[in-house]
Each structure stands twice: as structure tokens, then as C-alpha cells.
Amino acid sequence: MPTPLALLLSAILIIGTYFAMPFWPFRKSNYDPRGKHCYITGGSSGLGKALAERLVKQGAHVTIVGRDSKKAEGVVEELKAIAAPGQIIQCIAADLTSPIASTNAIHAACKPHADQAPDYVYLCAGFSRPKLFVETTKQELKDGLDGVYWVSAYTAHEACQMMSKQRRTGKIIFVASFLSYVSFAGYSSYSPAKYALRGLSDALRSEMLLHNIDIHIFLPCGISGPGFDAENRTKPAVTKKIEEGDTPITPDVCAAALESGLKKGYYQITDNLVTEPIRLRSNGGVPTNNFLLDTLWLIVSSVGVPIWRMTADSAVRSFRAKVEKELEAKGYYVS
């Protein structure tokens, strides 16, 4: 086990390296949205909307996709107000949990672009409805996979086929979650799909090297907004206890973190330092972001992550009697 002195020195090196990072040329990145067709699922709210605004300001042609056509059209008007002449800004209304609708949506978006595949695909669609597993219905379990995994997997599949058939390079960016690395009580209908999304992204990062298509994955923590508010309405008390002290960041800050990682050429992109130790403990052998910094984080994670896990498990045990009483009041038990 590392000595206290070693941990202190590691912490100093990590902090110093972190603040020096903006001045270090880690790797070349060809990320430049100017003039590119950027296709954003879940683009009518939250991270997707904030990202769309940033991309329009950088001169990109933007297509947003969402279920609510009226809401999406309203966002398009906002985007057009900040766009320059010649930028193509449009929306597509579609239920992306359907493979047919996903295919039709991306092809419709490409019509104004001579049917060429999008340059950048940002997969921001998804939702979270935390509940205890024993109180979750079978349909809710299925909805969790549909609304988190398949809603992105179908679009990613069609985008990969379009790009490769047309021999076009491009980028596909999955938006996963901190809960793609680690999970705990309350997220049994959500984190399995996020784990699956990370598995798909890892596989495609390797496979798409055959076609010169770049794959990235963004793993943020909580993002403030209507989606986060809806999540909290069903979130069990034990889950809130484990997350106590976590402050969600705004969609604008989150979008900035995503683009910062893309500009640095990172494969796995996070939005705060808290996620870094978890990323290094669970990265599945994918490329690191920076060898030196990641090595230091790995040392810290060898102590920090087990402590966090023990703390989380202790919190769950402390709720055992309370949950049992609540379930009993609902007539859950058979004896």
C-alpha cells in the first residue's frame, strides 16, 4: 500500500500536471466543427441543446433530433437566430428507440447535404428513472435499455454504415455516464444500459480503425435541467444519500468539457476530477488520455476507490430497516 508521503507527492504531481495540461500538446486532433454537418440526438434540451448552440456559433451545420417536434422546432428557431447566412439548421422528429425511425431520421437529415453522411454524430439522447430493483416493473427494465442503449446504438449503426459505404471519415461521440464505470443501489434499470453503451463504444473504437472513423465516449456526472429534476422525482432515498454532496453541472459547462476532450483527442472524456480515479480503475484497456497523469490517478484510485465503495455500502446498509418498513407498508412481503 502506498505510504502517506507517496500519496501526498502523487497528489501534488497530479494537481500540478492538471493545471499544466492546457499547455501540453498531448496529441494531434482534427476536431473542427466549422462547416461540418453535426447530427445531435436529444438535441432539443439539456446537453444536446447546449452542444448545438456551441456548434452553431462555431459555424457548423446542425441537425437536432427529438421526439417532441414542437419543442425541437422552437430550438431550431433559437439556433437560426445565432447562425450565420448559409448555415443549415434543421430538426427531425423521431422516436430513436425504433430502428426504422433511427435509420429514416439520419437519412432525412442528410438530404440537404447531398445525401452525404454526417461529419460528426453526437448521441445525447437518453433518460434516467432510478428505482429500487425489486420495485421496478419488467416493462421499466425494458424501457431502460430502449431509452439508454438502443436509442444510441441504432443511430450509431446507421452512421457507421453510411460513413464506411461512402468512404468518409468522421466522428461518432457516445454520451454515457459516470454510471458506465460504477453503479450502486437505485440504478439497476439505468446503469446496465450505460455499461452496454461503453462496451459498444469500446468495440467500435477498435473496429472503426478499419474505416478511419473516430469513436469517442463522454462520461459526465449529473447534469442540471428538466431531465435531472425528473430523475430526482423517482430516486430512492438511499441513492440520494450515496450521491450526497454531488452537485450537477450545467449543460453549458458539460458541453464545454465534451468539446475540450474532443479537441485534445481523448477517447474517454470526463467532466470532472472525481471521475478520473474511477476511469482508470475501469477503463477496459482502452487508450489513456495522458500516460503520466493517468498513472498518477491510478495510484490514487488504488486507495480512494475502495474507500468510496465501503462508504457507499455502509450507506446502503444503514437504510435496510427503513426500506424494509416501507416495503412492508406497501404489502410487498408474502409472510
UniProtKB/Swiss-Prot annotation:
Can you name this protein?
Answer: 3-ketodihydrosphingosine reductase TSC10
Query: Which Gene Ontology BP terms does the record give?
Result: 3-keto-sphinganine metabolic process; sphingolipid biosynthetic process
Q: What is its main location?
A: endoplasmic reticulum
Residues bound to NADP(+) are: 190, 194, 223
Q: Which residues bind NADPH?
A: 42, 44-46, 67-68, 71, 95-96
| Functional pathway | Lipid metabolism; sphingolipid metabolism
Q: What is the lineage of its organism?
A: Eukaryota, Fungi, Dikarya, Basidiomycota, Agaricomycotina
Protein role: Catalyzes the reduction of 3'-oxosphinganine (3-ketodihydrosphingosine/KDS) to sphinganine (dihydrosphingosine/DHS), the second step of de novo sphingolipid biosynthesis.
Q: What is its EC number?
A: 1.1.1.102
Q: Which SMART domains match?
A: PKS_KR
Q: Does the keyword Ribonucleoprotein apply?
A: no
Q: How is the quaternary structure described?
A: Homodimer; a minor portion forms homotetramers.
Q: Which GO terms describe its cellular component?
A: endoplasmic reticulum membrane
- Region of interest called Involved in homodimer formation, as start-end residue ranges on this chain: 141-207
Localization in the cell? Endoplasmic reticulum membrane
